[in-house]
Amino acid sequence: MGRVRNRATAQRRRRKRPGDPPAACAAIAVMGASRAQCPRVQVGVGSHAAAKRWLGKLRRKRRWRRAREAGSRDPLPSAPLPDPPAPAESPKELDLGAQRERWETFRKLWGLSCEGAAKVLLDTFEYPGLVHHTGGCHCGAVRFAVWAPADLRVVDCSCRLCRKKQHRHFLVPASRFTLLQGAESIVTYRSNTHPALHSFCSRCGVQSFHAAVSDPRVYGVAPHCLDEGTVRSVVIEEVGGGDPGEEAAEEHKAIHKTSSQSAPACPREQEQ
């Protein structure tokens, strides 16, 4: 007598035969996988090649899913940020080598900061043939520096105001003149007839420089207010200050108008 097979077992072991219709379905067990992980797959065509393609696609999806999950748990290290630029070195941090002692001596002798000492050296390079003069008023409240030749050409004006205050000066461009200190101590007098600004120290009354209103690019500096050691020679050139009678008449009118004494300034201060 023949054995009676279980219908489910027979259906599972059944293989496709050439005579089966194309629409027949075959149940294929997935090799190498457990029933829980890889259930039976039904392919409409009943082809092993189609099942393998589907299985490969499923495995690739699982691999990508595991890779994404691993990346979210353990992200890749980000690229290191670029180092911030190093701050600019200050003059104190410059590698001066064997010249550091000379640098410090020069700076202390002139009483300058590192920036001021560097400016003096750069100005010396930019103004060849000129000398760095320093000066100020009698009490020291006003101090200035100017680049000018060692041989000074001094103007001696004969106008009424310059004769009364004995003002002699040499002219320099404003770019070469620097007021070091005392801006708050300066009192400026402006005459009524000539556009000139005569600056005096409010403490000691010494006039060390003046400027012209018409040409602020030029300063007149008093040579007798310069510090010693930088002037080699002085050449004085006298210039006329106009008609004394006309100046006296203008001064008389100004006295009655302003109730205070005023006198004309140098008429040639605007020149050069």
Curated annotation (Swiss-Prot):
Its cofactor is Zn(2+). The keyword Endoplasmic reticulum does not apply. Residues 133-246 form the CENP-V/GFA domain. Residues 1-17 have a biased composition (Basic residues). Residues 1-23, 65-95, 240-272 are annotated as: Disordered. Zn(2+) 2 binds at residues 157, 159, 162. Binds 2 Zn(2+) ions per subunit. Residues 77-88 have a biased composition (Pro residues). Belongs to the Gfa family. Pfam families: GFA. PANTHER family: CENTROMERE PROTEIN V (PTHR28620), CENTROMERE PROTEIN V-LIKE PROTEIN 1 (PTHR28620:SF3). Keywords: Metal-binding, Zinc. Disulfide bonds: none annotated. The gene is CENPVL3. The keyword Membrane does not apply. It comes from Homo sapiens. Zn(2+) 1 binds at residues 137, 139, 201, 204. This is Centromere protein V-like protein 3. GO terms for molecular function: carbon-sulfur lyase activity; metal ion binding.
